[in-house]
Amino acid sequence: MLVSYKWLKELVDIDVPSHELAEKMSTTGIEVEGVDVPAEGLSKLVVGHVLSCEDVPETHLHLCQVDTGEEESRQIVCGAPNITAGIKVIVALPGARIADNYKIKKGKIRGMESLGMICSLQELGLPDSIIPKEYSDGIQILPEDAVPGESIFPYLDLDDEIIELSITPNRADALSMRGVAHEVAAIYDKSVHFEDKVLTESDKKAADLIKVAIASDKVLTYKARVVENVTIKPSPQWLQNLLMNAGIRPINNVVDVTNYVLLYFGQPMHAFDLDKFEGKDILARQAKAGEKLVTLDGEARDLIEEDLVITVADKPVALAGVMGGAATEIDASSKNVVLEAAVFDGKSVRKTSSRLNLRSESSSRFEKGVNYADVVKALDFAAAMLTELADGTVLAGQVSAGAVPTDDIQVSTSLDYVNVRLGTDLVFSDIESVFARLGFGLSGNDEKFTVSVPRRRWDISIQADLVEEIARIYGYDKLPTTLPEAAGTVGELTKTQKLRRKIRNLAEGSGLSEIISYALTTPEKAVAFTPNPTKITELMWPMTVDRSALRQNIVSGMLDTIAYNVARKSNNLALYEIGKVFEQTADPKKDLPKEIDTFAFALTGLVTEKDFQTAATPVDFFYAKGVLEAILAKLEITVQFVATKEMANMHPGRTALIERDGQVIGYLGQVHPQTAKLYDIPETYVAEVNLNALEAALKSDLVFEDITKFPAVSRDIALLLSEKVSHQDILDAIAASGVKRLIKVKLFDVYAGEKLGVGKKSMAYSLTFQNPNDNLTDEEVAKYMEKITSALTEKVGAEVR
């Protein structure tokens, strides 16, 4: 928000240096980015009256005689296309400084002496974006009453001081001059002076020409007035200066009035050419799929159902709260005008402006909020200005639909509540003084008082907001330093935090190093390495395609990290990550995804490098499985590994789903060689587990068990099996035998060869039995082995070797 200090001093009786005001505002809650003086660095710029102007043959130049308030006129050579005799212009005298500290000197152009320079606004340092289009390619023409020889600064308000405010979302009331004036008045305990305009209406009714309706809950209220017989012309210089100092380009008197009201009240407005309407029914509604609108910037916009539009005869004529349409634009031929003042849903406006990358002064205000109480006042003020500046006739009555609350908001608190929070010893008279300065109503006493908060301060709704206002106006620097009165409470980690920390410790104890990868990735990588991919949640305006979708797995990001390291000759890697993946089962454009805590690791290269004693040991499936099993064992969680060929990015013969109670909670295995080739990485093994599922499986209470005094007994068994039988099949068969004294099963040998026959393999297991209350006898162990052997023969067709 750019604030003209000249304008501000018209609204509040203050006379302090602008830099002092800026510092005071920053310390009371509204950050000031800086203070800029447009005239700074400029000198010896005066008003000139062009007495004569002759074309120089065969050139674009003009030889001018210019009165600069001296006894004799000056001869100045000028190349501007809009130079002509009789106009008042900006003259830089010899020795003058213009933009970029450029010094003007006497000189000759085509042999003709030039005693100065006739300047454009660009040459004074003003940006092209705010210069009126009629002067964008030529010199600035000053008002007719400008006096030759006088400084041009007062005529263009270049001697103004522009205070740039950085407005946070909670202080959107300061996006208007009236809001800033209230703030400054409160800081300095002054009164505000706002201009009132008397609106004169004709007997003719606006409702006879237009009708207004709302067909969306995103439009809170919509109000319109009709002004007839306007004369389109440039705005007076004071208004153009004011808009340019606020960073807005002057267009014409009608459009400039709407922008003036936007700056003054903070209420966005729009003006339509009534004669370009194809009907009288104005409807604010959601856009229809496939509708198009050419906006004022000349761009054709494809609309979607989430956009809000203003329609006439069911045709869009404006993007509500963002930008008007070119079809009903105010131009030089416009005579009859419809003025719009409305309140649109901020979220809807923000979505549309973001989707179309179309930001405007109006959209920024609707996004942060507007003052409901000023909608009617702003509309009437604009209509009154059009009678003054455009000679228009205002038709009787506003035409409106919908309503917004305009009454004050009541918030109650107590003096004790305030003093406890601020550590102060304020009395009730101090509170009365603060809210009087803010312009708020106050009733009650120190035990309980109620503040009537005007609608212009919609950021205030609870007791804490009142405390903040008291602290701001009383002065943060006056608040005493005190210790907190409330007793502290002992903190405790949540179950989720404890699990994360334990897994982190276990993973690092297994030799893994933690990384953090991006949660945003490509749509393709988002659903890779996912047993059950869901809908993709994509960003509307991603900075790059590589960071456009929320991940549904962690592994793809880990492989990017491995590829980065391998490319730099770091080949032996053991990495892990604890993070979130995002599952979307509903509409990604409307609903938030479900966040799932996930643990993943990736291994590649050598477990141990070779030396003079031992051979190198590469990472393999069983090593990766052992890492995961060791972590799960410490958590006392039992899972099942089920071979799968369904995951396209994983090796079909070296991949297993991780199941618990019949539910898939993750996977483990080798990255498919073709996928590894795409990443340009060597053989890599990965695992990914749902931490939410692990948390649910944790034992809530651990009960101490005495260490048994009785020894365990082990027996080995070698089985001849079909090569199709898996280790899990063996474990399931042994479990089916129902031997309660069996406490451990360990695979210690696997063999396949010609001696066993085609399609056969041998697997050897060590079985451990123990009775915690007594010694096991040979007969008991033999009985257990017999039951296990029978189960293996029956379930998997095993032969005991």
Curated annotation (Swiss-Prot):
Keyword set, alphabetical order: Aminoacyl-tRNA synthetase, ATP-binding, Cytoplasm, Ligase, Magnesium, Metal-binding, Nucleotide-binding, Protein biosynthesis, RNA-binding, tRNA-binding
Gene3D superfamilies for this protein: 3.30.56.10, Bira Bifunctional Protein, Domain 2, Ferrodoxin-fold anticodon-binding domain, Nucleic acid-binding proteins, Phenylalanyl-trna Synthetase, Chain B, domain 3
Pfam families linked to this entry: B3_4 (PF03483), B5 (PF03484), FDX-ACB (PF03147), tRNA_bind (PF01588), tRNA_synthFbeta (PF17759)
An example Gene Ontology molecular-function term: catalytic activity, acting on a protein
Top EC class of this enzyme: ligase
Position of the signal peptide: none
GO CC terms: phenylalanine-tRNA ligase complex
Positions bound to Mg(2+): D459, D465, E468, E469
Cofactor binding description: Binds 2 magnesium ions per tetramer.
Keyword Ligase part of the UniProt annotation: yes
Compartment(s) of residence: Cytoplasm
GO biological process: phenylalanyl-tRNA aminoacylation
NCBIfam families reported in the protein's UniProt record: pheT_bact, YtpR
Assembly description: Tetramer of two alpha and two beta subunits.
Entry-linked PANTHER family: PHENYLALANINE--TRNA LIGASE BETA SUBUNIT, PHENYLALANYL-TRNA SYNTHETASE BETA CHAIN AND LEUCINE-RICH REPEAT-CONTAINING PROTEIN 47
This protein's name: Phenylalanine--tRNA ligase beta subunit
Native source species: Streptococcus mutans serotype c (strain ATCC 700610 / UA159)
